[in-house]
Amino acid sequence: MSEWIEIGKIVAPQGLKGDLRVYPSSDFPERFTEPGKRWLLSPGQVEPISIELLSGRYVPGKGLYVIELAGIKSRQQAEALRNSQLLIEKGDRPQLEADEFYVPDLIGLTVINQLNGKTIGKVINIIFAGNDLLEVEKISTDTPVISEVVENNLPSKSKRSRDTKNQKKNQSPPSKKILIPFVKEIVPIVNFEQSIIEITPPDGLIDL
């Protein structure tokens, strides 16, 4: 899937004539309003299929688009596409301005506190709000036996204790998540070459 970029997800039918509600993961309205070829990946599919976008409109207050796809004429057909992804080819991405980023490129970057050089965690999601927020999973300082997880290539939650009486004691603590405003004052550096984001957090932000 590295050659594809998700631009939205079909969340529900709209009406009775095959229209679809799409929650966007792209900031470019033309992805949903300008007719042309798109790609569709339904749950369970390995490869996307080509589809034709006929029209689309933004729904104020809902944060989503209603689109019409060629060949989808009934609510039943639309329902069958629920949870499908709308995609574009990676090469179709427009050139961005300075300090603009594509969401998929930010996921997985390591977040570092510029003030002390310590690693905070990894970006796991972007939350779209008045100011966009980086959702960061903090690195736990209490995670036991990290080398064991790496050697077995299994996440810690998949490892089971043979001693059922000690199972709860040996479990890793749940990961903590924090939200970091994605603004220049707090996130001055995004370095894709090193796969890091440097932040200058205000007091208390990373302790929440």
UniProtKB/Swiss-Prot annotation:
Keyword Nucleotide-binding listed: no
Transmembrane feature ranges: none
Domain PRC barrel: start-end pairs: 98-205
One Gene Ontology term, aspect cellular component: cytoplasm
Region (Disordered): 154-174
InterPro entries: PRC_barrel-like_sf, PRC_RimM, RimM, RimM_N, RimM_N_sf, Transl_B-barrel_sf
Free-text note regarding domains: The PRC barrel domain binds ribosomal protein uS19.
HAMAP family, alphabetized: Ribosome_mat_RimM
Function: An accessory protein needed during the final step in the assembly of 30S ribosomal subunit, possibly for assembly of the head region. Essential for efficient processing of 16S rRNA. May be needed both before and after RbfA during the maturation of 16S rRNA. It has affinity for free ribosomal 30S subunits but not for 70S ribosomes.
Protein name according to UniProt: Ribosome maturation factor RimM
